[in-house]
Amino acid sequence: MKDKIPFVPLKEIATIKQGLSVRSKIWKSSTREEIEDLYGLQKNDVVILRKMYSNGKKIAALVEDTKIVVVPSASSMIIRPDTTKIFPLYLKAFLEFLPSDKVIKELKLTSKKHLLSKGSLSKLLVPLPPVTEQIALSDKYDKVKTVDFYHRYANPIIEQYDSLMKFLWNCYQTDKKDIIS
């Protein structure tokens, strides 16, 4: 009998270099090798499942070993990680950060939640602290395996990001000064 799907901390999400939609049916019987052939999956690629539950929460989960049978209830995608780490806590802070409205206008989107689509995520310019600082912040929430991006109080990783908002604002002000000068 197959093991349950292994969930890993979402702190391990990296900047999305390339997103690829995957038909749900493919996971019901395919091995990683078959998926590699079909979708050009590479060694360090990570598969993300996005599940929509009856209570309206949308959950993202990372799956490292696609040899395990995976049957998502909604949609899935493959991401190709880049070297610069970006964690969901940080992404959430950015999406609720006032200057992100400028990004929304540039992408011609009507709602911030659309920024979470694979196409839009790859275009986001998120000001990032050093990787060590991101890891330190994310390690506080190491036990958190899933994040509901749409409800601030649904998950402790989202409840405690106010310090990141301050950091984002400082980054934004610094960038603005550099552009003006």
Task: Locate predicted features.
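A short beta-sheet element
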Residues: 43, 48-96
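Short, functionally important structural connectors and interaction interfaces within domains
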Residues: 5, 12, 27, 31-33, ...
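Structured loop/turn residues at beta-strand edges in well-structured enzyme cores
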Residues: 8, 42, 119
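A short glycine-rich beta-alpha junction/loop motif
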Residues: 69-77, 108-135
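Sequence-specific dsDNA recognition surfaces
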Residues: 11-46
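Short, positively charged
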Residues: 89-109
